[in-house]
């Protein structure tokens, strides 16, 4: 698969659309303009990869639409070389955005085929420093904690307590919360060992966050 001038032009158009939708973070927009999203979607959807749409990637999972990726990334308020844990690798696109922004990225996926595919793709695109893990996202990565930021890319029916424990004091977690057809984006800041501050944002639609693993 190639990344052509046509693809680059479509990415520029997409970035303009994201600006119009309210995304203001220039580094995030530049990352989206650089990363070839058509590499991360199934071949069937390649020609539509730069539409602001989600697409199925197998195993009942999706690649989020670019606005959602930009929105969540913006809410993280990333600082240089933040250590970021992503729950739900999926296609690997969100991890690529974080890596392009210069973050230390740890990403975990409960579906082994998706995890292996994302790892190979990220390495092929020059994002080999991203650390990919096959495992249960509800458990996080306690051996690698604490994290400056934690990003959940699936709808959580509850705030995972194990993940809160893995957040640095002063750190932020961004999570779509709820079990209905739409979920509210929430940002949680850890103020102290047992004290957290919660902010609420817009509503989105995500696949559910599930416990356990699938080979």
Where are these regions (language model features)?
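Class I SAM-dependent transferase core
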Residues: 1-85, 93-97, 101, 114-117, ...
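Conserved nucleotide-cofactor-binding alpha/beta core module
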Residues: 77-197
């Amino acid at each position: 698969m190639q990344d052509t001038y046509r693809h680059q032009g479509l990415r520029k158009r997409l970035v303009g659309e994201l600006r119009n939708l309210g995304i203001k973070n220039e580094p995030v927009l530049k990352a989206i303009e650089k990363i070839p999203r058509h590499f991360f979607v199934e071949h069937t959807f390649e020609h539509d990869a730069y539409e602001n749409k989600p697409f199925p990637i197998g195993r009942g999972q999706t690649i989020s639409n670019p606005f959602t990726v930009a929105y969540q990334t913006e809410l993280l308020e990333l600082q240089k070389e933040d250590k970021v844990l992503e729950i739900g690798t999926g296609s690997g696109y969100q991890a690529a955005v974080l890596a392009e922004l210069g973050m230390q990225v740890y990403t975990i996926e409960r579906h082994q085929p998706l995890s292996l595919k994302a790892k190979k793709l990220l390495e092929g695109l020059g994002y080999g420093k991203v650390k990919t893990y096959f495992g249960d996202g509800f458990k996080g990565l306690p051996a690698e904690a604490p994290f400056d930021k934690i990003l959940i890319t699936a709808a959580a029916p509850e705030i995972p307590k194990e993940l809160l424990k893995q957040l640095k004091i002063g750190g932020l977690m961004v999570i779509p919360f709820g079990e209905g057809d739409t979920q509210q984006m929430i940002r949680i800041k850890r103020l102290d060992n047992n004290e957290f501050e919660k902010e609420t944002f817009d509503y989105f639609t995500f696949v559910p966050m599930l416990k356990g693993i699938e080979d």
